[in-house]
Amino acid sequence: MVCVGIDVAKDKHDCCILDSEGTPLVDCFTIPNNMDGFKSLLQTIQDCSQKSDKIKVGLEATGHYSYNILGFLLDNDLPVYVMNPLHTNLYRKSLSLRKTKTDRVDAKTIATMLLSDVDLKSYTDTAYHNEELKSLTRYRFDKVQERAKLKQSVSRLVTILFPELEQLVSSIHGTSIYALLSEYPGAKQISEAHLTRLANILVKTSRGHYRKDKATHIRDAARTSIGSVMPAKSLELKHTIKLIQELTSEINEIEDAIRKIMDELKPPILSIPGMGFHSAAMILAEVGDFSNFNSPDKVLAYAGCSLSTYQSGKLTNCYAHMEKRGSRYLRYALYTATKYVCYWNPVFTEYLTKKQAEGKHYNVALSHATKKLVRLIYALQKSGKAYLAVT
């Protein structure tokens, strides 16, 4: 057996190659993060191994720094094992009491872990392509968060420039109101606008939801508004709305790409009443291959939804808190999905109500419902069967 440990960095990668006895087959070496370096690593691995040797290549999950070398190794049909940095760090500390941590030591630690009896599963080509879905869902999440902050800015600016507007419309974040404020960013500008122009904007952009009488009400309110006349704030409002519109267009494009992947996957969890398309996509992207988890509890732990445990002598934690050490994206998707599933699925609605009746806080009861949902998701994805409602 030949075990290759790679410590990944931005500009270079440190490598260590051991045989089945743990003896270095070659001195630890460093390769640059480019194609010449990758080919040099591949050639060294081939020189150190025989055709009958089983080769294992291990590296840490270091985010985007490992994407390129991981793809190269998979393209060359090498079995790759991606490790949790927490595991490798603890394993390194268990090998020596000395506080020695260098890139080459880390590379040797990874290679040694491959030789041990640690339960590791190889990184499949399917998992590599699953990164596409993960990248898209995380990218969408960040864009939505960015847009939410800009919407808060719009609310703040409207409160300064035309505070009465919020009482006249169902939402100031609708397409028609954005169109109105883009052209007339303030009470003063609206009060001086021609009524026909105001009505045309509202009727056209709201698809008939608003009519001329709404334009009249808005202009009348603008003429008696207490809003400040601040050209700088009006300019900021116009630009902020433009940024929101651009972000919305980008989010729609991202969602189209996600939908294409989801249409190919046809995941069983979409059959759960209340399970949203976006939450399902993020859950699948973050978990990846469910066969990597031998129980639903492992999925919960990966999401950081497991309860922490502390016991020392007679002291035992009475109020255990959530670990929150896993994927924050998965944790967010699970809790968002649970809220909607509890609303639309009678079984989960009853379960949530039962937990609250036991005296549990809503968030605690929701966490119990999340565990129940994870068990259901795990069962559906493992079996490949759609959800069947209990009658």
Task: Map each language-model feature to its residues.
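A detector of single, family-specific signature residues
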Residues: 1-391
